Curated annotation (Swiss-Prot):
InterPro entries: SpoVG (IPR007170), SpoVG_sf (IPR036751). Keywords: Cell cycle, Cell division, Septation. This is Putative septation protein SpoVG. It comes from Alkaliphilus oremlandii (strain OhILAs). The gene is spoVG. The keyword Phosphoprotein does not apply.
Length: 93
């Protein structure tokens, strides 16, 4: 399965969540509402989840092995970095 499209919507409110992402795989399957969050050790992705009962959350969709998670993170962070660079260039003009 290959990542064929990454669409990022930056979150403008202050806080730890930086953006919401939609990722398309093989031009056939899309996962919406992946979050980019700034944690103590830098940025990480949080897969879409649903609240279950008393404050517990359960992922709706997620990679089942670390290599797939790494490929997904790399694709998302590359696009996020590209978007951040373009915003910075536009601000400096």
């Amino acid at each position: 399965m290959q990542v064929t499209d990454v669409r990022i919507r930056r979150v403008t409110a202050e806080g730890k969540m930086k953006a919401i992402v939609s990722v398309t795989f093989d031009d056939e399957f899309v996962v919406h509402d992946i979050k980019i969050i700034e944690g103590q050790n830098g940025l990480f992705i949080a897969m879409p989840s649903r609240k279950m009962g008393e404050g517990d959350f359960r992922d709706i969709a997620h990679p089942i092995n670390s290599s797939t998670r790494t490929k997904l993170q790399d694709a998302i962070f590359a696009e996020y970095e590209k978007m951040s660079d373009m915003e910075e260039e536009a601000a400096n003009e």
